A protein has these predicted regions:
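Conserved S/T- and glycine-rich ATP-binding loop of Class I adenylate-forming
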Residues: 72, 89, 120, 190, ...
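Conserved AMP-binding
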Residues: 76-79, 100, 226, 232, ...
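Structural core segment of the AMP-binding/adenylate-forming
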Residues: 63-64, 91-170
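Conserved structural elements of the adenylate-forming
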Residues: 51-59, 172-178, 192, 206-228, ...
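Hydrophobic alpha-helical segments typical of transmembrane helices
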Residues: 20, 24-25, 107, 129, ...
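Conserved pre-ATP/AMP-binding loop-to-beta segment of ANL
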Residues: 33, 144-145, 160-195, 202, ...
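Conserved AMP-binding/adenylate-forming core of the ANL superfamily
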Residues: 16-17, 24-26, 34-79, 83-87, ...
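Flexible, non-catalytic linker and terminal segments flanking ANL/adenylate-forming cores
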Residues: 1-18
Length: 236
């Protein structure tokens, strides 16, 4: 006998929307457009501009053929492009792979190959080790250099050389803020790729989906007791 609770109750656009953190930034940009979202050195970026820049990054990536199933890798410290990548990359349905900035060249090369990296965004702070890794890797991604304007002049390590053909700010500037970004087809679609430490062998890839990322954001907000317009110091 057919179950009446399974008849004519299929999932559709009227009763279901995939969980994804992409809608969090979209709502913040609509609700608090002029509120400061990112503080980095002398920079103050509002939610409106955070959203616009993420869209432009997504647009620029899409113009270079990036889409579902592709991996975009970043080697960045706690800078605005890191945050923009967390939204701009999945807006194209691609997957974000964030490298640990303390890895050596051999492990970076392994991850670039294993992830089949198509685009690599590199902070010049880490260009030396990335250049060494690229010499070891089989992957030949599009390299985009990021030059942090707030990188301390007296930092222990000076900025490295440019190793790519494109500059991050120029790359983003060429994007279109009217880009028609895409919700995930399914909330179980991959949003990011991380790697284990590889203590018993090569690092293992760990895939996160949109639903998991969205729920983790809820959990972190509740666990940290973050009130309205709380300012969070990102140190990890």
């Amino acid at each position: 006998m057919a179950n009446p609770y399974e008849q004519d109750l299929d999932r559709n656009a009227a009763n279901h929307q995939p969980l994804t953190p992409l809608t969090y930034l979209q709502r913040a940009a609509m609700t608090y457009p002029d509120h400061v979202a990112i503080i980095h050195g002398r920079q103050r970026i509002t939610y409106r501009d955070f959203w616009r820049r993420s869209l432009k990054l997504a647009s620029a990536l899409a113009r270079h053929g990036i889409g579902k199933g592709d991996t975009v890798t970043v080697m960045l410290s706690n800078t605005p492009p890191m945050l923009e990548a967390h939204f701009g990359v999945p807006m194209t349905k691609a997957v974000l792979h964030s490298l640990n900035t303390r890895l050596d060249a051999a492990i970076i090369a392994f991850q670039l190959d294993h992830a089949e990296t198509k685009v690599l965004i590199v902070d010049r702070e880490f260009s030396a080790v990335v250049k060494e890794a690229l010499a070891l890797a089989k992957a030949r991604p599009l390299i985009i250099d990021y030059d942090d304007p707030d990188y301390a002049a007296d930092a222990p390590y000076p900025k490295g050389e440019r190793i790519g053909l494109l500059d991050y700010e120029q790359f983003v500037a060429a994007g279109d803020e009217a880009f028609a970004w895409s919700m995930p087809d399914d909330e179980w679609d991959a949003i990011s790729l991380n790697y284990t430490s590889g203590t018993t062998g090569n690092p293992k890839g760990v895939v996160y989906h949109h639903r998991g990322a969205a729920l983790m954001a809820y959990t972190n907000t509740i666990h940290a007791g973050m009130a309205r317009h709380a300012v969070y110091l990102w140190t990890l």
